[in-house]
């Protein structure tokens, strides 16, 4: 007996078909329910619900999200406006980086200095960039060189010492004027020192032309004041103003002796300042000679001087200045002879950044000048810097100061020897004329103040009470 076997049907059973259709529908529901923004899918949504949501999304316009999606690094790098150093107050052009090439004074090579948001005028003068988004930097903190002395006005002539806020405003105005002034034509001569030594390999420049006003009024001042190196008769001292002169004219010309007469006394704090110099050693000379720098030993300018003995750069308030220096005739001979019998101390109202660099060039081994004092060691009175010799910590009976501005030693008038201001006279010999008198003071080995008082009679030039 044969049994018949039936082959399995190739068609799927209804149960399997139903299961497959159910699985396909489930997967399609999940795909439709996935949000486009990356949200998590909802498991409980049915096909009908997903269809409704799909219909709603397709019929409503898309709204911009408050927080836009993150952009890729490439997209962020393209937008340069995202990186700013100052608040954006409006649409402004991108900052331009101006590059200035300046000839190096040392080796003749070209050097580049980058200044942002500022245009550079000739020799360090700044011009504001109108496209800048940041406020312009100011350079009104003080001049590099010895500032011009300010006259006591009727409003502040009774001011106390140390009140330097009004003076800073006046000094700021002077800086602006000095940087805009153009110097007169200079006489062209060879760039050699008084003793014939050339400084062709030196380089620098700094010094605002704050002495331009002094140069113009030099003849007027010297006519009113007798020669400083010759004895002055008491009757030829202070002369009153002419009757026809107006009140305003009386205040136009700076009178150093009127300033000295009305200078306020030192405060207790200023009198008790700690000495700025170290104690003397056994090798230190017994007498001290304090020397001014500008217009006494040298003349410096920010304008190019064709007959300059040397020139060098100075960085001051992020601006590079080129300083041109003239050396007074017999400058080196004077220092070499005086350094053998005096403790030479340089005391200047100029900035240290300029004066210290200049002295490093003139006296690199400090064989001539033992100590250096700068503006920070002065006493500020109504914006004027006075050199109080008490800060030296030396015996004032054996201390001498030489300065072209008598008001600079207003507190120790009997210790001061005035000298004519020097700018460019090649025939000047004022330093040589002082050597015999200074040598005699050391030989006498006495209090120098009576001898200085009798020789120069500066007290007789003070105005009457």
Swiss-Prot record:
Biased composition (Basic and acidic residues): 60-79
PTM sites of type N6-acetyllysine: 26, 57
Family matches, as Gene3D superfamilies: HAD superfamily/HAD-like
Top-tier EC class: hydrolase
Modified residues (Phosphoserine): 28, 51, 85, 104, 134, 165
Region span, Disordered: 1-133
Bias (Polar residues) ranges: 8-20
Alphabetical list of SMART domains matching this protein: CPDc
Function (record text): Probable phosphatase.
Protein name: CTD small phosphatase-like protein 2
Organism: Rattus norvegicus (Rat)
UniProt gene name: Ctdspl2
């Amino acid at each position: 007996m044969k049994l018949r076997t039936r082959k399995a049907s190739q068609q799927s059973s209804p149960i399997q078909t139903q299961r497959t259709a159910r699985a396909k529908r489930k997967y399609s529901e999940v795909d439709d329910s996935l949000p486009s923004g990356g949200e998590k899918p909802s498991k409980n949504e049915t096909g009908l619900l997903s269809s409704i949501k799909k219909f709603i999304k397709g019929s409503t316009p898309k709204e911009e999200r408050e927080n836009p999606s993150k952009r890729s690094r490439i997209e962020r790098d393209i937008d340069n406006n995202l990186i700013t150093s100052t608040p954006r107050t409006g649409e402004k052009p991108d900052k331009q980086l101006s590059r200035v090439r300046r000839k190096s004074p040392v080796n003749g090579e070209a050097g580049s200095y980058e200044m942002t948001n500022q245009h550079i005028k000739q020799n360090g003068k700044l011009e504001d960039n109108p496209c800048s988004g940041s406020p312009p930097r100011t350079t009104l903190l003080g001049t590099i060189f010895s500032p011009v002395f300010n006259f006591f006005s009727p409003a502040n002539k009774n001011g106390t010492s140390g009140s330097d806020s009004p003076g800073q405003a006046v000094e700021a105005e002077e800086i602006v004027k000095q940087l805009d002034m153009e110097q007169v034509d200079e006489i062209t001569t060879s760039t050699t020192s008084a003793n014939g030594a050339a400084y062709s390999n030196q380089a620098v420049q700094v010094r605002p032309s704050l002495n331009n006003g002094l140069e113009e009024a030099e003849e007027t001042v010297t006519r009113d004041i007798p020669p400083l190196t010759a004895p002055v008769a008491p009757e030829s001292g202070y002369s009153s103003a002419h009757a026809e002169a107006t009140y305003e004219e009386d205040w136009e010309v700076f009178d150093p002796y009127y300033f000295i007469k009305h200078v306020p006394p030192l405060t207790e704090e200023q009198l008790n300042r700690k000495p700025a110099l170290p104690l003397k050693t056994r090798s230190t000379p017994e007498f001290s000679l304090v020397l001014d720098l500008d217009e006494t030993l040298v003349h410096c300018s920010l304008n190019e001087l064709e007959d300059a003995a040397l020139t060098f750069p100075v960085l001051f308030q992020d601006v590079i200045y080129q300083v041109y220096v003239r050396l007074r005739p017999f400058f080196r001979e004077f220092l070499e002879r005086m350094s053998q019998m005096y403790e030479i101390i340089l005391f200047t109202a100029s900035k240290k950044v300029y004066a210290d660099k200049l002295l490093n060039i003139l006296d690199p081994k400090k064989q001539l000048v033992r100590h250096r004092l700068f503006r920070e060691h002065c006493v500020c009175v109504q914006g004027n810097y006075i050199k109080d010799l008490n800060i030296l910590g030396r015996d004032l009976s054996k201390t001498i100061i030489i300065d072209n501005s008598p008001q600079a030693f207003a507190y120790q008038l009997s210790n001061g020897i005035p000298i004519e201001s020097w700018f460019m006279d090649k025939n000047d010999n004022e330093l040589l004329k002082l050597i015999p008198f200074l040598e005699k003071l050391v030989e006498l080995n006495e209090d120098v103040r009576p001898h200085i008082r009798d020789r120069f009679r500066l007290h007789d030039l003070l105005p009457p009470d």
